[in-house]
Amino acid sequence: MKRQLIIIFTLALSSLAFGLEEGKIEVKVKCVISGDEIDKEEYTKYKDGKVYFCCGGCKSDFEADASKFTTAANYQLVATGQYVQGSCPLTARKNKADKVVAVDGVSVTFCCNNCLKKAKKSTDKVSMLFSDVTFDKSFGKPNSDAIKTNVSKKKSAKK
C-alpha cells in the first residue's frame, strides 16, 4: 500500500512540477546530445518512450550510437514523466518517502540513509542514478509490469 502511495505521489508531483499534458511537452527538457532546448518534433523511440532532441543532427547522432547517451536519455524519460521510480536505484529495495534527493529537478527516493548519503556525496548524481544498471532495476513505465515485478521479487525473496 505504501509503495502504491509513493508511486501515485511521484506521478502527481511529476505532473504538477512539469506541467505535462497528453501529447505535449512543456518541460524545459534539454537535448541529450547538445544540452540545448528540445524541438518536440525531433524525437526517437527509446526503451518504451521517446527521447527528444534539439535538431535532426543530434537525433541522427543518437540513433547511430545511443550507448554514449543512455544515462542522459534515461534521465529524460523520468524528467518527462514517461518512466517512474519503483525502488531504490542503488539497492533495488523498497523506497522510503523521506529519503529523497533532487537531481536536476527530479526527485529520487532511497531505501535508507546510507544510500541517501552516497547520492548526496556524488559529484555526478545523474550518472550514478540514471545509468542503465540502476535505471533498469529501479525505473519503469507508470503501472507497468516492470514496477510490479520489482516489488514482487523483493517480497518473495524475504520468504
Where does each model-flagged region fall?
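Sec-dependent N-terminal signal peptides
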Residues: 4-14
